[in-house]
From Swiss-Prot:
Organism this protein belongs to: Burkholderia ambifaria (strain ATCC BAA-244 / DSM 16087 / CCUG 44356 / LMG 19182 / AMMD) (Burkholderia cepacia (strain AMMD))
The name this protein goes by in its record: Methionyl-tRNA formyltransferase
Annotated positions binding (6S)-5,6,7,8-tetrahydrofolate: S121, L122, L123, P124
Cross-referenced Gene3D superfamilies: Formyl transferase, C-terminal domain, Formyl transferase, N-terminal domain
PANTHER family from the UniProt entry: METHIONYL-TRNA FORMYLTRANSFERASE, METHIONYL-TRNA FORMYLTRANSFERASE, MITOCHONDRIAL
EC id: 2.1.2.9
Taxonomic classification: Bacteria, Pseudomonadati, Pseudomonadota, Betaproteobacteria, Burkholderiales
Length: 327
């Protein structure tokens, strides 16, 4: 089906690329795509295009990559050029998903139907940069995707629609991300169909209660504090897959832990002590309970099941992982 509603799209990672693909495949014209500038990535630190740029280029969509959209920011000339491009590109609505740049009021006012954001949480819980990670880390039973009409606040706009998703006990940020991306793509296409048909989308202000913020994930958070309860550490490991991973330091080497589950404590070993190193998993004492680690990665190596890891990098009961710096 071909649609007439013209959609400018702004987004950067895979989560956003799923939405752009759905919009394009549904037949909505996309006269312009905004995405962040290419960034160095990988072992060679070569410049890499974003997932959104790769999709847009592959499908012949015009792409702009301004470093900022704020005239008062660090790149005023580039921002001015980008804003002029938005003004001169005929369109009806802008869809924004994990773009990574702030949109000032001047930009929000350009599209006739405003700017719609796809956010990976059930707002107002987990406003901010890392909603999927923080939902798993906190032990939430469910999360979801919210469509909102954007305003200048941080994820504070009125809500258009939402989809709820249960968080499974073995979900990681990677697995949950993929389900939420698919739901976000479905929601935005449905909303654009309604917008084209009705001319507007009803929206409900966010509740004042239940607001939490999902701070950006920092590498410094990766270090596991073994004094915490085992269930908390297991959630941290799942939340930090694929980035930055849960890090356990042994004799100065940072070992990444990628899969773990809480189990009953064995004895009264100090937190961080390896209680058992078996093919089924490495048991580590925690502040309460113990953690069975079933997937590990040594520096420069690959993720391996415990059995394969131990074959090449033996661990033994009595060894102790260090506590984080300053602990």
């Amino acid at each position: 089906m071909t649609h007439t509603l013209r959609v400018i799209f702004a987004g950067t990672p895979e989560f956003a690329a799923a939405a752009l693909a759905a919009i394009h495949e549904a037949g909505f014209p996309v006269p312009l795509v905004l995405t962040q500038p290419d960034r160095p990535a990988g072992r060679g630190m070569k410049l890499q295009a974003s997932a959104v740029k790769r999709y847009a280029v592959e499908h012949g969509m015009p792409v702009a990559q301004p470093p900022s959209l704020r005239r008062a920011g660090k790149y005023p000339a580039e921002a001015a050029d980008a804003i002029e491009l938005l003004r001169t590109t005929p369109h009806d609505v802008m869809v924004v998903a994990a773009y990574g740049l702030l949109l000032p009021q001047e930009v929000l006012d350009i599209p006739r139907a405003g700017c719609i954001n796809i956010h990976a949480s059930l707002l107002p819980r987990w406003r901010g940069a890392a909603p999927i990670h923080r939902a798993i880390e906190a032990g939430d039973a469910e999360t979801g995707v919210t469509l909102m009409q954007m305003d200048v606040g941080l994820d504070t706009g009125a809500m258009i629609d939402e989809a709820r998703v249960a968080i499974a006990p073995d979900d990681t940020t990677a697995t949950l991300h993929d389900r939420l991306a698919a739901d976000g793509a479905r929601l935005i296409v449905d909303a654009l169909v309604r917008l084209e048909r009705d001319g507007a989308l009803p929206a409900t202000p966010q509740p004042a209660d239940g607001v939490t913020y999902a701070e950006k994930i920092g590498k410094h958070e990766a270090a596991l504090d073994w004094r915490k309860p085992a269930d908390v550490l297991a959630r941290q490991v799942r939340a930090f897959d694929p980035f930055p991973g849960g890090v356990a330091t042994l004799d100065g080497a940072a070992i990444k832990l990628w899969a773990a589950e809480p189990v009953a404590a064995r004895g009264d070993a100090a937190p961080g002590t390896i209680v058992d190193a078996a093919p089924e998993g490495v048991i580590v004492a925690c502040g309460s309970g113990a953690l069975r680690v079933t997937q590990l990665q040594k520096p420069g190596g690959k993720r391996l099941p415990a059995r394969e890891f131990l074959a090449g990098s033996p661990l033994a009961a009595g060894q102790r992982f260090a506590l984080p710096d300053g602990a």
